Amino acid sequence: MHKVIQSASSETDSPSVMGSGCGEGHGNGNANGSSVATNLAFTKFFFVIARADDDAHGARLRAAGGNIARGFFNDFDIDDARELQAQRFETIQFCVREGDAPADCPGPCLPQARHMVQVSSKYRPRLQEIDEELRRRIGDSAEILSLEGAFRNPRYSSAELVQYSTRNAPPRRSGRLSKNVILLPMRKTSEWWEKSALERHSYFYPHVDHNSATPVKGHALAAEKGIPALFRRVYHNPDGYERAGEFDFVSYFECDDESLPVFDQVISSLRDVRQNPEWCYVQEGPMWRGRRVLRW
């Protein structure tokens, strides 16, 4: 999220309904909301776009992956029960893109990256060290894009909504079962942040739309089908919202193969501004889809 998508090669869990940050306060601490929330831990996604995806690059990539994984728990086999036993935030997860790269994609283009790794830590400088080490090892043979995020406690407008969005939510499962990963960075428009916190919260609920004067589902009901099918997290910009040229959130999903159509249905429903007017204020970044793997 730093500088929208940071090019590392050129520069030295709280579940939600779908995770676009409707319930969060204002990131810069003005009268419409609260100050920047406490970052509990940090995460960084690295997207590797090989200049020549050949055997030589593959060997260097595997060696680099093994090196940066030292000292981290591998998330591939961590499920809900094991997460409670492990150092939850000192983790690493490797992923490989599903399908072919898009033929035409304006840069910087995350979907062009065949390989992605997510590293999480309570200590942000540790992630910068990983950034520098990865660039040192493969930066001459690949472009490396990165997104930063932070774990924060959920701040919904009611306990009822928390219960609604978590009651039937699935536990996290290992990568052998929940094989798919989907990432969607996004930002909210300035018009969104100009609204009061109370008005922003209302977009989560069924309500009467101000513009059409008709009843609409709102965010929660629009995303309802995804609650039992998708494991999800929202990562927040660690430096606050409304920062020029940066994303506010990264929505993160895991699911099995059978649930992929559910994700597509949910994102389509959320994009339908006739039922979810909140999406009028959402600017989506490039979506990345891949498979969780034990190692590169």
Predicted regions and their residues:
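Alpha-helical oligomerization segments
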Residues: 236-247, 252-296
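A short linear hydrophobic-aromatic micro-motif
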Residues: 230-236
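Short S/T/G/P-rich N-terminal loop/turn motif that feeds into the first structured element of a domain
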Residues: 2-230, 242, 257-261, 293-296
